[in-house]
Amino acid sequence: MQKRVVILLLDSFGIGASEDARDFGDLGANTLGNIAKACFNNLADSNDRNGALKLPYLESLGLGLSALKAANELPLGFESKPNLIGAYAYAQELSSAKDTISGHWEMMGAPVLFEWGYFKDKKNSFPKEILDEIMRKTKIKGYLGNCHASGTEIIKDLGEKHLETLYPIFYTSADSVFQIAAHEEKFGLDNLYTLCEEAFHILEPLKIARVIARPFIGANREDFKRTANRKDYAIKPHKKLLFEKFIEEKQGEVISIGKIADIYAHVGITQKFKAGSLMELCDVTLEQVKNAKNNSLIFTNFVHFDSDYGHRRDISGYANALEYFDARLKEVLENLRENDLLILCADHGCDPSFKGTDHTREYIPVLFYHKDLQPAFLGKSESFADIGQSIAYFLGLSPLDYGKNLLNFKGQS
């Protein structure tokens, strides 16, 4: 029987500080719980939303119950006995990190059991010899930034100087990343991509996970804004991914929506669809759910929860986006085929109520829906790789090296 898998990954949607959160300075972080608390207390009201957080379709898949198991506390405003149609778990990350790459790789069978390279200094973050080599290889005359920064704030602070000099803006964060911002029209998108590609090759020996192109437009600090033409240059995964097994063993299609292909360095991806906004990501996902052939894996990363609301520490915006997503989830559920497996999960936390602007080390929800899947609690996963192993089981693939299968269908013992 031909099967499909649909993975909807809500980037940064953690559900409570993990057991090792103290090691990351993240004790007390709870992305969902703290958003729900703010909403319940009318602290996230805006022109777009008000009152308690309303996520009926996510609740029906087990989100609230998963959060209860992870944090020992039901999110405020959630039902203790929802009309459950899905099976749910929560997962601890095996990789010793809280970044996008580590979380995504682990769930597809390649946990990061080595240390990424990081730029830890808040100012003068990058080694001079690296900067000199980038300048020599790319012929740029100078650069701005060279610090830890919020991506939206640094273009406000340095965007006008960038337009005067055409020096690219280099910055980083607590993640293993080197980001380059430049004006899409004045500096040129192709020039930015070429610069990022060269920087990626220079930084690869340092095990920097990603170089990210961050194009923006606008004429001054009041109207600078990032565009949808972000591009990630990522190190290739070190182990065979679930995607590759699916292609080799079942001749499957692996459909990337959003930044998925970039995260996996395009390994094992057969079709790619970009989208610039949360609405567009939902639209493209729904289109693929309706039209993708059987024997397909559809994987969407909903990046805006992280980039627009988590890092920006925008509780109300995050809540509004979650409620919008939940309404669109109804459409996905209505268009699933007879033998589709739907999975909702996250890659790390990014609590908008927490100190700083970085990711937070949290448990993630793991929610499954299939017509023959018993609605039940599936336990705590000790690795995100349980997601990939469960998919491998469902698709009839050979086992991955990491993770355990969580699925038990009706009629099975």
PLM region descriptions:
Residues 1-413:
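Feature captures the catalytic ectodomains and active-site-proximal regions of enzymes
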